[in-house]
Amino acid sequence: MAENALPKGYEPRDVEERWRRHWEDNRTFTPDMDAPGEPYSIVIPPPNVTGALHIGHALNHVLIDVLCRNARQQGKKVLWLPGTDHAGIATQNVVERALAKEGLSRHDLGREAFIERVWQWKEEYGNRILNQIRMLGDSVDWTRERFTMDEGLSKAVRKVFVDLYNGGYIYRGNYIINWCNRCHTALADDEVDHMPEQGHLYHVRYDFEDGSGSVVIATTRPETIMADTGVCVHPEDERYAGLIGKKILVPVIGRAVPLFADTYVDREFGTGALKVTPCHDPNDWTLGERHGLAFIQCIDEDGNMTAEAGPYAGLTKEECRKRIVADLEASGQLVRVEELNHSVGHCYRCKTVVEPHMSEQWFVASTKLAPRARAAVPQMTQIFPESWMKTYFNWLDNIRDWCISRQIWWGHRIPAWTCGKCGKLIVSEQDPTACPDCGCTDLTQDPDVLDTWFSSALWPFSTMGWPDKTKDLATFYPTSVLVTGFDILFFWVARMMMLGMHFMDEVPFKHVYLHALVRDGEGRKMSKSTGNVIDPLAMIDKYGTDSLRFTLAAFAAMGRDIKLSEDRIEGYRHFVNKVWNAARFSLMNLPEEAPAALDLDNVKGMHHKWILHRLEELKASQAAGIDGYRFNEVAQGLYRFWWNEFCDWYLELIKPDMQAGGERQATAQYVLWTVLREALLLLHPFMPFVTAEVWQALPGHAGDDIATKLYPAARPGCRDVKDAEHMELVQATISAVRTIRAELNIAPSYRLTTLVRPASAEDAATLEEGREMLMTLARLDGLTVAVDVEAPKASASSVVAGNEVIVPLTGAVDFEAELARLDKELGKIEKDFVQVNKKLANESFVSKAPADVVAKERARAEELSDAKAKLEALQQRFRDAIGK
């Protein structure tokens, strides 16, 4: 028996902590830059410093870790680079809330003191998520940990901004932007969450200035009427033929504005006449520019009405809406109000309704950068699943310039200064001391900071030392693959593509794998309000990390959301225990030292040949599956091999070998040792902790670290399909006897006699070769394999690949007792069957009960019908056996 026997039960907490510490202390995952091997690199999607580990993070990190550990096994030079994002708006909001508890605001502190306070918060709490990530067993290189506001990354951000500005790719100008009244900052288009809301469509009468009539306009935002500077209709709309060019009066304030035509107008919406409010709608802004309209702002940055709102100045926009609707109704200009379901934009951070707002902002000319990013897919970068390519192309084809300035204090401050004397704008990597034109030293830096996604878009190369020409950049850029959620395809992936192509002249990653969402077991989105959130840390504490990891991988089918429930995680905890117990059994049957090597290509014993064949199939399918990002298929293949083939079959088959001694035992020990260690290597990327613990307990592996070992080499000589087919016939025959035993309620301890009428001479020889296995695992007292066997009247039979398996029942079954038992069971089933059918025959139940309840009853009826048919067939078999 091997000395390094494992404890009876697997305790994940102690094992995991020990291996985490071992890997980090020994810098196991820091790549040796001088070692041979193809580079393989992945940058972590940087979590927010404000964040806590959620199940989506866990999925993302498990999949990346599988890829990285697998790549190391292939002998590649692997870098998985970790880090965090400063998360401008989110972090500032957290610190502002903390200040509010002290009765302070950021303005009370001032900019410098507030930023210092944020840094203090970051140092105290910002590493929380990284410590939580450590719990997952991520094989990252912690020596290369980065933060988006590190000195080196900040240097890269400034250089990119200045280079883009000097190249005409960044500009400043007035435009309609998305404005959050709560966060007091601009938002990019993809930072706006559009949610359905129940609202109203107000039909308002606008009178012509000359008193000749009126036009009815439909709007969802009557509070912006005071900023109207035109009314637009479609040039081919016959309802307004002859009216184009007339002056029309804006209700309440009486401003005369033009009625003009533009093909932008949808003739089918509302009345076909559109109020144009350039300062409060991006499409109206475009119309205003195109037709030379005035630009008037009636809602300010706080969501209050400006002086331009006339009698409503000072009101909130919500109060203004109520007042103006009442006033329009009183004046007779409110024609009617309709209920309307429409999409309303909300801030992705605080969920406040977003206000279109005219403001001077900084923009990246994305329209200039997009073409190269588009052309790179799929020639240089492949997206998995391929279905997301169309979405990627559509977004880039319809891209708008990216608003990158944010009116907050925490973040990369825009490197632009204005001269107080001559007004010159100075954009510089270094802080200027004087104006280059007039020499004035009174320089004011732009107060805004850059959108968080701006620095994140540089992550693949800024983290490796760019703009310096570092060894990391030369070795690991472009990265091998990006694994991330589909929800940030536009926020992050496309922008990394644009800036990577522009500054590195190469794509940032060769592959992009977009995983789906993790939902609850019923397919619902997880949310705190629903109470269905699965906390990964709680699951790790309860079931161990390997259980959670394997569950997520096993359900990570490409392009399909994951339905996750705690019972599934618990189920894979049983799998971890199965691996542990299989290892314990193996160690009890292995010598203290590594067993003597054998030529496995010529090993004797069909069960040995079979398990080696299945192991070779697993190696090949796993390598192809991971390369194709089919994580679920690989995980399910591992599960089948370990649970069904290795544990349920092979370990049972070798028990007689281990008792036999001599060459037979030595052969079994070497095959067992080989299969166990190679199966551990295959399982390791998915379950790093339990495999590491078992590995170092194997004979010949004391002190070894499985994380540094290579993928098991292929053995072409063990891929003979015939060997596997022979064993599978023996297995199927054993299963057939076991099924008959279970169906007929024959005690497991009772040894049966079995007759087999073989389909061919080859099958007969195979069954004879497997006689000992058949006798042992099917618990037989006798076995006859012959073409002329006769089935006794009282017998049960089954056909396996053309071979008839016959089990005589006399003495094995008490027919009278079994018939009585079956009568009793059938009576209960028939009673339940009548009740269910009665319920389904009730039209009131079928029409009024919830659909899932009706479906459940129908499934129950089908289940009872099947059970009834099986019991009746069994009953008839017993009657035939005794001539009843």
From Swiss-Prot:
Localization of this protein: Cytoplasm
Locus of motif 'KMSKS' region: 525-529
Binding residue positions for ATP: 528
A GO CC term assigned to this protein in UniProt: cytosol
Biological process terms in GO annotation: valyl-tRNA aminoacylation
Reactions accelerated catalytically: tRNA(Val) + L-valine + ATP = L-valyl-tRNA(Val) + AMP + diphosphate
Keywords: Aminoacyl-tRNA synthetase, ATP-binding, Coiled coil, Cytoplasm, Ligase, Nucleotide-binding, Protein biosynthesis
One Gene Ontology term of the molecular function aspect: ATP binding
Chief site of localization: cytoplasm
SUPFAM superfamilies linked: Anticodon-binding domain of a subclass of class I aminoacyl-tRNA synthetases, Nucleotidylyl transferase, tRNA-binding arm, ValRS/IleRS/LeuRS editing domain
InterPro entries: aa-tRNA-synth_I_CS, aa-tRNA-synth_Ia, Anticodon_Ia_Val, M/V/L/I-tRNA-synth_anticd-bd, Rossmann-like_a/b/a_fold, tRNA-bd_arm, tRNAsynth_Ia_anticodon-bd, Val-tRNA_synth_C_sf
Pfam families named in the record: Anticodon_1, tRNA-synt_1, Val_tRNA-synt_C
Sections of the chain in a coiled coil: 812-884
EC nos: 6.1.1.9
'HIGH' region (motif): residue ranges: 47-57
Comment on protein domains: ValRS has two distinct active sites: one for aminoacylation and one for editing. The misactivated threonine is translocated from the active site to the editing site. The C-terminal coiled-coil domain is crucial for aminoacylation activity.
Family membership: Belongs to the class-I aminoacyl-tRNA synthetase family. ValS type 1 subfamily.
Known role: Catalyzes the attachment of valine to tRNA(Val). As ValRS can inadvertently accommodate and process structurally similar amino acids such as threonine, to avoid such errors, it has a 'posttransfer' editing activity that hydrolyzes mischarged Thr-tRNA(Val) in a tRNA-dependent manner.
Subunit structure: Monomer.
Protein name: Valine--tRNA ligase
